[in-house]
Amino acid sequence: MFLIRDIFNTKPGRAKDLVAKMKKALPLMRAPGMQNARVMTDTVAGYWTVVCETEVEDLKTYFDMGARPPSPEAEEAMKGYMDLVNGGRREIFRIE
């Protein structure tokens, strides 16, 4: 089992907008083998940090999901999200 953590640094004051987009898109982007998807915001981390976290049985599941085109609904939900972020990174952990 792996934990995938996508960490976004949003533009000042735009974290809530990215959270709204992600919460709308997450149910549309689920795939078999994915579980425990959630969106979190910083409390004591760098300001305007949004984290999208999910668990997958294996990394192939995750990368296959990213290789397939998004549904029109998911694409619409995330439309313009790059205008909200300054950058970010991905962390992948093996759950022991």
Residue ranges of predicted features:
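An amphipathic, aromatic/His-enriched active-site/gating alpha helix that lines ligand/cofactor pockets
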Residues: 20, 24-38, 55-92
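Short acidic/glycine-enriched loop/turn segments that link adjacent beta-strands
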Residues: 44-48
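Absolute protein N-terminus
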Residues: 1-2, 96
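Residues that cap or initiate secondary-structure elements
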Residues: 12-14, 58-60, 96
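Short, surface-exposed ligand-recognition loops at beta-strand->loop->(often short) alpha-helix junctions
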Residues: 9-20
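Short beta-strand micro-motifs enriched in acidic
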Residues: 40-42
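Short hydrophobic/aromatic beta-strand micro-patches
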Residues: 9, 53-55
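Active-site-flanking beta-strand signature of metal-NTP-handling nucleotidyl enzymes
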Residues: 3-8
